[in-house]
Structures are given as structure tokens and as C-alpha cells.
Amino acid sequence: MQELRLVLILVGALAIAALLFHGLWTSRKETSSKFGKKVDIDFDSDVDDEQAAPMRGFDQPKEDVVVQKERKEPAFAREEVPTSDDPLFEGTVSSESNKFTQQEKPTVQQAQPQPQPQPVVQQVQEPTVGRIEPEAKPVAAPVKREEPTISFSAIDDEVLTQPEPVQAKVDIPETSTYLEPEIIIEEPEPEPEPELEEDVIVINVHGMGSDRFSGNRLFNSLEQNGLVFGDMAIYHRHSDLSGAGKVLFSVANMVSPGHFQVPEGEEFSTPGISFFLPLPCYGDAEHNFKLMLQTAQMISSELGGNVLDEKRDMLTPNKIDEYKQRVKVFCRK
């Protein structure tokens, strides 16, 4: 549909253009047929009349020189005037022909060119300058001048004895070297880290039910696991198995006042014992904690007891991890 519409529009536009062109062509043809019957006019006479008209009423002065050049006009052939049926055109043509026949061609006289006046050159006489003779000056009597005799030896002596030029001493001030003061930037002292509060890791070993640990059997188990009876009447684990060196952890009686009555032997008994590791401690805290846990488990298995936490509850893996986290805080320091 769109293509058909475009084709129709183009065809309509071409038809309108053809109609317009045909109308213009016919109107031109009619006008040319009406105005084509013109009388040939002698353009030479018209031009001559136009040039001669302004000169008829005036007398030209004789001094003016008029030079008329021959103009080469195109020659137009006379055509026969076609007869027209229109009475209006016949009247105009006849009147124009009569008018042109009545007019006479003016005669133009060629004036002889006069010689142009040559400019007069005036000669200017230059003024003559006379020689002025200087006045005669009185002549004075010649005076005899005695020229002094110059001895070169004296000049040489003077040259030799001339004092040497004295060089002026100029005190040049010493330039003082300006040293820029060193800028010392004091580094801020690190703030002291807050001291950690002391902590204590406690592991208890308790007898089964109402069982109690007897004295000799308990003391032998403690000594076999590297514990030594010492200060405060309790057992200690030292850095050296011989009992010398720093204390790593200690074992006390679960019953107050917490010390052991070793001399009593078989008469001594207790429901349980407590292992405790003070923090911070000597050496590696993690290593000391592992050693204390292993020792408590060994003694518990030998005596037939249970390993409990600080609240005397069963020691679970989660509780052991909590102990390890508390120990790591002191290991970083």
C-alpha cells in the first residue's frame, strides 16, 4: 500500500508539472505572435539622434575639441513588415514609420585636433656667491723657541724607579655557614599495655563416689609423675625433674587448709586433690598447661578417680578449649 501511494503521488506531480508547462508554452506562443510584428528601426539614426539632440540648442565653443570615433554598429537586415488584421497595430506602425522618415540624420563635423599647449619651464637663476677674501692679519716677528734636550737615561731611571702599584687589601667578611637546626621528631612512647589480671587454671581429681585417696598410695603416685613435696606442704612440678628450677604448677589437698600431712602416711586420706597453674607463669604457658593436664589424667587413672573442672564438674572437651584460650592470652605477652 505504501509503495502504491508513492507511485500515485509521483504520477500526479508529473501530470501537474506537464499541465503547467503546456500552459506556459501556449501563453508564450500567443504573446510572441502578437508582438513579433515589429518594424525594423534604423538603430544608427536613433543613436545619432540621441547624440545630436543635446547639441542642437547649444553653441559649442571653438576651443573645445570634439573627437568622434566611428562606431561599428551591427547591421540589421530590413524585414518586411507583416500585415496584421488588428487596426491598433496598423496605426502605431504607420505613425512610427512616418516619424522616423521625417527626422533627418544630423551631420557630425569632425573637428581637427589642436596641438596641446606645452608647459612653460621657468629658469631660476642661482645666486652667485662671491669669494670673500680674509682680512690680512698682522705678521708677528718669528720667535725662536729653544727645544729642551731630553736625556733618555733619565727617563729610563724614572721608569726603573717607579714604585710598584700597591694592591689594596680588601677584607672579605667570612661567610658564616648557617646550619639549619635539626628537627628532632620525638616519637611518641608506646603506651604501656595494660597489665593482665592474674589468672589460675584449676583441674580437680576426685575419687569415685565416696571413695577417698589413701596417703601412701597418693604420695607415691604424685612422686612417680615428677611432683616434689615442698613449700607450703604441697607438691610442686619444677622445670627440672630433680626438684630444682622454677615451679611450673602445683598440687594441693582439696580439703582446707590444702596441705598434705606426709608424715602420717597411712593415716592420711582425702576425697580429692587440686592441680593449679598460676598465670603468668615461667616458661611456655601452653606447654605447662598440657603437662599439668596429662599429669592429672595419669594420676586419676592410677587412683581410680574422675577429672573435674574448677567447678568440680566433669571436664569436657569444650572446657579444655576454654582453658586453652585463657592460656593463649598470656602466651602473646
From Swiss-Prot:
Key word Transmembrane helix present in the record? yes
Q: What is this protein called?
A: Cell division protein ZipA
**Gene behind this chain?**
zipA
Periplasmic-side positions: 1-5
Give the residues annotated as coiled coil.
none
> Which region ranges are annotated with the description Disordered?
72-119
Keyword Transmembrane helix assigned:
yes
Q: Which Pfam families does the UniProt entry name for this protein?
A: ZipA_C (PF04354)
- Entries under NCBIfam families matching the protein: septum_zipA
Residue ranges annotated as transmembrane are: 6-26
Can you say where in the cell this protein is located? Cell inner membrane
State the annotated membrane topology for this chain. Single-pass type I membrane protein
- Main localization (coarse): membrane
Keywords (alphabetical) are: Cell cycle, Cell division, Cell inner membrane, Cell membrane, Membrane, Transmembrane, Transmembrane helix
Query: Which of the residues are on side Cytoplasmic?
Result: 27-333
Quaternary state and partners of this protein? Interacts with FtsZ via their C-terminal domains.
- Indicate, by first and last residue, each region the UniProt record lists as having compositional bias (Basic and acidic residues): 72-81
Low complexity: bias regions: 108-119
Disulfide-bond pairs as recorded: none
| Family from the record | Belongs to the ZipA family.
Q: Which domain of life is it from?
A: Bacteria
